[in-house]
Amino acid sequence: MTKDSLDYLIKIAIDHPYSKDLLLARKEYQKYTGEIFEDDKSYEDRMALFLEWYIFERIDPSKEQTILESIISNSKEVPSSILINIKQFINNIHGLFIVKKIKDGSVRVMNLFTDKKYDIYEPSSKLYFSKDNVFEGRLLPYKESYFFTGNFCFHPDGTKKYIKSEIKKILTSQKSNEKELKFKKTTMSKEFKVLNNTTRSIKKLQEKVITINNEKEINKIKKKIDGLEPIKSIQEEKCLMLEKEITIFTDTKIHRQGKLDKILLMQKLAYMRLLFERSRNIDLKNIYKN
């Protein structure tokens, strides 16, 4: 059922109107993964990986959506049984995996970006995988399980150390951004506390005015309230600005940048794999390097 839904999704994505940017997108993709030709051994696999990127990850600048999100938004013509699966595809996991264990009909892999392990139903597990293989792949959720799309970019033995070192750079950057986000949230929490104190002070003074009959005392309290109101407005504005700043930072640095860094690394590694595929007597270490 997952494969049927994926095939249906691809069929829609490469047809009008979703295919309008296909050629432009291919140029964007090959800028990082290298230009591919029909006589390349991995041509079909790479074209399949390109289509996955086009559907699941490329943002259409005019809509600020992926092709997948656009298809879901305009889902009137999609059969309901397939639409249910396609909606789940939003939670796909694109990553660099290492094979931990191979069984008849299944494989256990670990996502090197998160260290999370997955037991995947894979009838051809012994044909596709070998223990300690490092590869790029995409997991699609279906019910309570995950399935690979079947399109992979396998990296040669001897590249694991380099790949892990590149992943570590991304994770270090992510931790730095998360630390900064935590600091921003702490700052905002303190500012809201100050605002709440000011608001409570104003409320207490307003309640006090009601209980007093002395005009002089009333005017004195009202003067205090008048002095606190502009302070409250400034504090409210500051809190709103901090909220907006945190929202933007979370979207750009935590979500988008984190995802983009991973994608760019996988594309860079795919290009290195292509160079290795075409190479003649070139040491692997001279390809998988910065």
What residue ranges belong to the model's regions?
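Short aromatic-glycine-enriched beta-strand elements
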Residues: 105-109
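A short macromolecule-binding patch
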Residues: 116-121
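Short nucleic-acid-contacting surface segments enriched for D/E, G, S/T with interspersed K/R
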Residues: 122-138
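Short, charged beta-turn/beta-strand-edge "cap" motif at the junction between a beta-strand
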Residues: 138-145, 152-155
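C-terminal effector modules of nucleic-acid-centric enzymes and ribosome-associated factors
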Residues: 149, 164-211, 215-290
